[in-house]
Each structure stands twice: as C-alpha cells, then as structure tokens.
Amino acid sequence: MIARCIMVLGTSSGAGKSWLATALCRWFSDQGLRVAPFKAQNMSNNARVVAAPGGGQGEIGSAQYFQALAARTEPEVRMNPVLLKPEADTRSQVVLMGQVSEELTRMPWRGRSVHVWPHVAAALDALRAENDVVVIEGAGSPAEINLHANDIVNMRVARHAGAHGLLVTDIDRGGAFAHLYGTWALLPEDERALIQGFVLNKFRGDAALLAPAPDMLRERTGVPTVATIPMQWRHGLPEEDGVFDDAGHVRAGAGGAVHTTVAVVAYPRISNLDEFQPLKGVPGLRLVWARSPAEVAGADWIVLPGSKATAADLAWLRAQGLDAAIAAHAARGGRVLGICGGLQMLGEALIDTHGVDGNAPGLGLLPLVTAFDPAKTVRRTRTAFGALRGAWSALSGVAVQGYEIRHGRTAQHPAMAAAGDVAHPAIPGLAWQNARGNVLGLYLHGLFEDAVALRALFGADVPTLDAVFDRLARGVDEWFDPAWRAARRAGR
C-alpha cells in the first residue's frame, strides 16, 4: 500500500508550516498509523545527525528530526534529502542524502534541480512505500513565480505525491485572505486543484469576527478554510528558520525572580541555534541573544555557540568589542561555554592550511589550537564527563548524548603545554576546561537537550518533547474542522 500524503504549504516563510507539520505527525501517529515526515529541500544551519543507508550517519534539517520524533519513528536522511547550509550571503554548502556534495556546492543553484530531483523523488517514494501517511512540508511560498521552473520542494513534490495540500497563512501579519487568494491564483490550474484547505494561523480574538471572509474565499476558489489556529506564543519547538525569538525571555521562577542570565552570542553564521530551546523552559532563567557588549553585561553565563564560518564570526565578534567583554567576564570568574565553533574560538589559534575556514587568532581563554580539515565529522555521540572543577563541577560523571557536526581537530597548544599551561580534558578529544574551572569548551551539541545534564546545571526539569508533541496533537482536534478530521481518519 502506498501512503497518502498531506502537504503543508505556506503563503510565506514563518507562516507556521514546520510546527503544524510536527503537530500533524503526532496526530496521525495517535491514530495508530505509521507516519513519516518529508521535506525535499531545507535551507538551515540547524541540523541533526541521523541514520543513513548502509548503517552510516548523515545530516538533515532539525525540523524534520523533530517531526520524526513526533511521528514516533527513527529520523533518517530520506526525510530531508537536500539540505542547504548557508556559509555566506551568496554561498551554501549542499548536503545530499546526508552527505556533503562538493560538486553540487560548486554548481549554480539553477542547475542543481535536474541533478537532485531523482534523489528527492526516490526518497519520497521509499517513504510512501513503508508508511501509511507521509506529512510533507513545503518551503517559503509555492507561488514564487521566478523560482517555479526549478521547483523541487513545493508543487512539484505535491504533484508527484498527489498530496492533499493545506495552505497556511500568518493572519497576525495582516492581509491573510489576500495572501491566500493571491498564492492560489498564481498557481497553474492543475496545481490549484491540489490545495484542499486553507489554514489561518496566529489568530487573536473571536473567530466569529472572520465572517464572511472564509465563505467569500471559498466562493472564489472552491477551497474551504479548514482550521483557525490561535496564536501560539510559545509552542515549545525551535523556530525552523533559526529566528532569534523570545529575546530576553524569562520563565518565572520562585516569586517570579530571575536567578540566572544566559547570554548566547548571536553571530551572523550561528549554527544549531535550536539546541538552546530547552533553556526557555527553565524557571528563573533569562535567555539573551547578544550582539554587543551591553547585551552580555551582567550575564551569569556567556555562551559561544556553533558557527558555519568560525573565522569570519570570530572577526565579527571582535569588531563588536565582544572579545574584550568575554575576556573580562572570564577574568571575573564568570562562566563561559563554547560549543563546537565556539570551542574553537576559545583557543589560542585557528589554523587553516586547506582553505576551509580561514586562519585567525583565538580568544586565548583555553590553551588549545584548532586545525581545520576538509573532512567533516558527522556523528551521534554518547559519552560522559570526567571530573570537572569549579563552576562546571556539577557535570562531573554525567553521561550525555548529543551529536558532532564539524570541520577541525583540536589539541593542546604545544608551546603552552611545554610550559605547563594545559587545558583539563573534561572529555578526552571532545571537551576541555581551563585551570580556574570557569571556562568550558566542548564539541558536543545537545548538552541542554539532555535532561540529566540540564538538571545538574540548573536543578530543574523542563517539559519533555513528547509532552510538547502531545499538546500540539490535541490542538489539531481543537482547531481543525470536524469534517476535515473525520475524512483524514477515514483515510481520505
């Protein structure tokens, strides 16, 4: 039996496609169905390491990773066959079926579709053969008429799958009915027929006030409005496009007080931004995306996250004066955490003899040196911290699981080691700590997504992903028209 396909399309980026697809994955799974997510092509530096054919591992966009978890299935590379990871304003690294393709990366984007479409179609066909339902997510808008000829992610996928299309719009921005009608009208007739329902997202107020607009829209298009979704201020999932949402967000602690401020340096090519989502659920924690010294002032922690362009982001950091602010914070004994590219920045030097990322002096907070390597490390990792000292001692002995996505090898700085200045190996080959104990760098992404580590660091439990998925699935029953839900349950 070939799976039926539901496709979530949007009138724009940020309309709500990703989290609605996630909600539908859990809702269909709750019906006892085998469900898989799919997005033909994703553009994001938020990526996860998942299973690849032949027992290997590869990368997919984080949104499809979370959708797979919501669907109660193992995430794997077929769920996102093409991933574009921006490295500069006009250049992206191309990941095909989980692996970097240098050939496609060098190719002009308009010429790629003919090469990648067979992989997209094969991945989708395989998922359809193994599941009852495939929930497909589109990208941007399907009515970008300048891109339509090279489309591999929206209506070409919908046609290939014969998908039941839902077109979502953000009504909070204004002009929602014009966006829905305009998007529908710009599609060729055969593609219009695939749009089976309109969805109004981020609505505030009394839904009765929308009348008679949904009926008028149906008269013009033949498409019913099947759901009105209230504004979800904090739905509990990371933003798919890496938006710096909830700046200064605080979840009230005892008495509504702020106990800890964590400032994450938001450099231009930040990667894996989504791994900080759990911090928004820690009571009394204030999370700040910092782009200036003023925004790290008074922070208890400063975090240097991953980067897709480490040397360039380090240069940006210096240009903002953040290097001095971070050094002063560390000198006062404040906690500093570097993750992946952030770890590399904390060392003495970045050495690039292969033209991967560029040479640069580091921040000098750890006596380490990083040599960039064209070979990319992509793997899931389960390990445990050794004995840590000082501010990070709560992590001593804590077993963690996460993932590595990086270019580069980091080691003790030879000259400094000879002089007795050695970084303490918190996890051999993966994490190092300074002698004072307040600066920690690690290659492992996902520290804050590990419940045991989060409890050790903050003494708090946060809602599990399953609880978030279940709440979203209950929302489908609340927001969607009963007839639409009944038809989906009946297999139509």
UniProtKB/Swiss-Prot annotation:
Would you indicate the residue range of the signal peptide? Answer: none
The record's annotation in SUPFAM superfamilies points to: Class I glutamine amidotransferase-like, P-loop containing nucleoside triphosphate hydrolases
- Give the positions the UniProt entry annotates as the active site: 340, 445
A GO MF term = catalytic activity
Pfam annotation, one family: CbiA
Question: Might you name a Gene Ontology BP term for this protein?
Answer: cobalamin biosynthetic process
Per the record, the pathway is: Cofactor biosynthesis; adenosylcobalamin biosynthesis
Keywords attached to this entry: Cobalamin biosynthesis, Glutamine amidotransferase
Q: Which residues form the GATase cobBQ-type domain?
A: 259-453
Functional note: Catalyzes amidations at positions B, D, E, and G on adenosylcobyrinic A,C-diamide. NH(2) groups are provided by glutamine, and one molecule of ATP is hydrogenolyzed for each amidation.
Family assignment from sequence similarity: Belongs to the CobB/CobQ family. CobQ subfamily.
Mind telling me what this protein is named? Cobyric acid synthase
